[in-house]
A protein has these predicted regions:
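Hydrophobic h-region of N-terminal signal peptides that target proteins for export
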Residues: 12-21
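Non-catalytic cap/lid and distal C-terminal segments of serine-dependent acyl enzymes
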Residues: 21-270
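Single conserved hydrophobic/aromatic residue that forms the stacking wall/gate
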Residues: 1-11
């Protein structure tokens, strides 16, 4: 009957929708380097749930954030995962700035993100275990962390991005607990110099990484991002650099992630 046919059609539509539902997992990943478990949120597209290998984008939160920051900031992330067939991995980086801290041996988040977490992800999910299918990005502290990680571990990541990143920490010596990780600026200038992204560029040449960098025009990190852009130009390192109206806000990053995912998706498909 007609009603029965309509019910069947609706059932098929519901079944199709169910097949395309991304899954959000929260897991504890063991860090041998820090001797503790680290909370990580995984956004898994239907393809990965079905064991079809997918590329991976690691997303790092900002100061004061946690593993759930990105799924809260961008509720559409599961839908984006399904549309692009990308796994998103969002670790809890505390307020570490994603360094292996020279002052605090309990904070070895560079090792965790670039080694332990990548190995866990590739060992437990349907990934493409290759730098050409692996990208990393983040906001604010996480933008610094993403570029820091990728530039220093270009064998692990093929692409990297930064949204409103603190890419030169030295103009902000009293902010965001960085002195807990590096020591007081006045007494440890060499360490601060060595742990800022703009001083890592000698580790890469053009073509090593696909890079996207953006910052709001009303952001307090705008000038350090412009400086990074100019340093990359001076070294003839190709990169996308975007400034748009906006400040250091969730509204800005909710928009930024769209640009970064598009950039990474194109990189993965090369």
């Amino acid at each position: 009957c007609l009603v029965g046919s309509e019910m069947c059609i609706r059932d098929r539509c519901l079944f199709a929708v169910m097949l395309q539902a991304a899954r959000v997992d929260t897991v504890l990943v063991r860090s041998a380097a820090m001797n503790k478990d680290v909370k990580v949120v995984y956004v898994l597209p239907d393809k990965a749930i079905g064991k079809q290998a997918c590329p991976v984008v690691y997303l790092l939160h900002g100061y004061g954030g946690n593993a759930r920051s990105w799924v809260q900031l961008k509720p559409e992330l599961p839908q984006m995962a399904d549309e692009k067939g990308i796994i998103f991995v969002c670790p809890d980086g505390k307020n570490s700035w994603y360094w292996d801290s020279p002052e605090n041996p309990a904070y070895r988040y560079e090792t965790f993100v670039t080694s332990e977490l990548v190995k866990y992800t590739d060992g437990n999910y349907a990934t493409i275990p290759d730098r050409k299918a692996r990208a990393i990005s983040g906001l604010s502290m996480g933008g610094h962390g993403a570029l820091w990680s990728a530039i220093r571990h270009k064998d692990v990541f093929g692409a990297a991005g930064s949204m409103s990143g603190g890419v030169d920490i030295r103009p902000f010596p009293q902010n965001w607990e960085m002195n807990k990780q590096l020591g007081e600026f006045a007494a440890n200038k060499a360490s601060w110099d060595a742990h800022t992204v703009v001083n890592q560029l000698d580790k890469i040449v053009n073509g090593d990484l696909a890079l996207i960098i953006d910052c709001g025009e009303a952001d307090f990190f705008l000038e350090v991002n412009k400086d990074l852009h100019n340093r990359l130009l001076a070294r003839k390192i190709d990169h996308d650099f975007i400034t748009r109206p906006g400040g250091h806000t969730g509204t800005y990053w909710n928009n930024s992630i769209d640009y970064h995912v598009l950039f990474f998706d194109k990189f993965f498909k090369k």
